[in-house]
Amino acid sequence: GADIITANTFSAQRISQADYQTEDYVVEMNRTALQIAREEAERMTRLTPNKPRYVVATIGPTNRTLSMSPDVENPAYRALTFDQLCEAYEEQMMVLSEGGVDIFMLETIFDTLNAKAGLMAARRVKERTGRRIPIMLSVTIADASGRTLSGQTLDAFLASVQHDEDIFSVGLNCSFGAEDMRPYLRVLSEKAPYYISAHPNAGLPDEEGNYTETPEMMAAAIKGFIDDGVNIVGGCCGST
């Protein structure tokens, strides 16, 4: 089974939850999601003590972007500020740190500035608690150009985040199926001084929303990840 279990916390911060009028429940959401994942990780570790399981809290990009305007008529407009996003992430990460999470994973990164807000929040939590938590960064690229939605190449992304001392791994998630992801993983493995992660989709959805890759197809492609320098493998959309 899995070595790392993901807590269901992807959108559990008040920026995303405000759309559903549930922002006042984010502390409870994170605490409960982490508890469920922690209990399962500990149960599996007891069954196989030679293979400890770890819990990662997934932290999504929110439904806002700091680098781009949501208003085509006003390109200078931003839906939120860097400080507002930092505060929302810090609130979420503080609960997770206090609950004993093993790893933070900032994933589906499409805007590097959003990711930098997450890194800043993690640093503040570390300063407040004295607890250092390793960070996984997982980028999603927009198309075959290999750039994020905000226009950065993977090289540029790495240059933007390498100042942070707590980064444990960088990688890719979503974007493509496993085979199509491989060229971009090679770019990361050649340039990044970290472990490399990959969480591909099960292909791309068809017109009915069904993902086209079977487990056997994904497994065959993922075997090649070893040659691409990948250390951590999971799945994204359509893979469960």
Predicted regions located by residue number:
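Domain-level signal for soluble alpha/beta catalytic cores
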Residues: 1-240
